[in-house]
């Protein structure tokens, strides 16, 4: 197979952490061609999606003394070519958020890939319809008490009723802009005004879950089925458990309650073409559904001795065989 990965500039990626690199390595190890491009290298020509593509050869990371070690250099890029994305068997959309205009325009370009010829993971229309904070709201039995609003007075009422809450911007990633907000906070007005841009943008406010102190679980789903998980723990005084904010990771198991959550959302994910997804769970409650560029494979493989990226590529192989 020929697989294309739409990524951030490859020199910016950390091969010891980045899930996109893990997927590319797995594809190469399994005998497939790996090509890379970027969101700003996409075009539409004669109503078809094209891209500046470069074939890449990778030196896979090695697990030494419990940590991933990368060669230097860890990749080699070949000459650029301008080609139709339909020359690829599958295209992985792996550009990191925020989901801004540039990101959305890239998904519109991907609409012009004929998915009868080339599988796009995740489906561009599915990505657009699945805000990573808002998507979870349809699963009312799985989520904590939540509001979404730009109205400061309504937010205040909710916070005063719940006592302790977490405020989340709707378009950020990796814990950016997430704030702990409680009744009586002297900075309440400033926090809400800044987060909502003076009442112009809605934010999500959720009941604070004390179980967050025990970790925030990331569960990786492949076509709606859980294939691995890790627990993320906050560092120091920061209440956020994200790896990007300095949090640490620990081995974990998927509980029956978490299996139930996965079952609740599986049909929706499949219907929306959201094949590779990471969900976040705290204390048995679904808090986010990550569909743009979910991460965690490197850490799960290191902790559990698994090869999750291989499972993903093998799923693509099997799916394309069935399709053809």
From Swiss-Prot:
The cofactor named in the record is: Mg(2+); Mn(2+)
EC number(s) in its UniProt entry?
6.3.2.3
Note the PANTHER family from the entry.
GLUTATHIONE SYNTHETASE, RIBOSOMAL PROTEIN S6 MODIFICATION PROTEIN
Q: Known catalysed reaction(s)? A: gamma-L-glutamyl-L-cysteine + glycine + ATP = glutathione + ADP + phosphate + H(+)
The family annotation for this protein states: Belongs to the prokaryotic GSH synthase family.
Enumerate the Pfam families for this protein: GSH-S_ATP, GSH-S_N
Write out the GO cellular component annotations.
cytoplasm
Metal-binding in keyword set: yes
UniProt entry keywords in alphabetical sequence? ATP-binding, Glutathione biosynthesis, Ligase, Magnesium, Manganese, Metal-binding, Nucleotide-binding
Name of the protein this chain belongs to: Glutathione synthetase
Q: What InterPro entries does the entry give?
A: ATP-grasp, ATP_grasp_subdomain_1, Glut_synth_pro, GSHS_ATP-bd, GSHS_N, PreATP-grasp_dom_sf
**Residues involved in Mg(2+) binding:** 288, 290
**Which gene does this sequence derive from?**
gshB
Name the Gene Ontology molecular function terms of this record.
ATP binding; glutathione synthase activity; metal ion binding
Cofactor: record remark: Binds 1 Mg(2+) or Mn(2+) ion per subunit.
At which positions is ATP bound? 159-215
Question: Which residue numbers delimit the ATP-grasp domain?
Answer: 133-317
The source's domain of life comes to Bacteria
Q: Which PROSITE patterns does the record associate with it?
A: ATP_GRASP
Q: Does the keyword Nucleotide-binding apply?
A: yes
The enzyme's first-digit EC class, named in words, is ligase
Q: In which pathway does it act?
A: Sulfur metabolism; glutathione biosynthesis; glutathione from L-cysteine and L-glutamate: step 2/2
- Protein's organism: Nostoc sp. (strain PCC 7120 / SAG 25.82 / UTEX 2576)
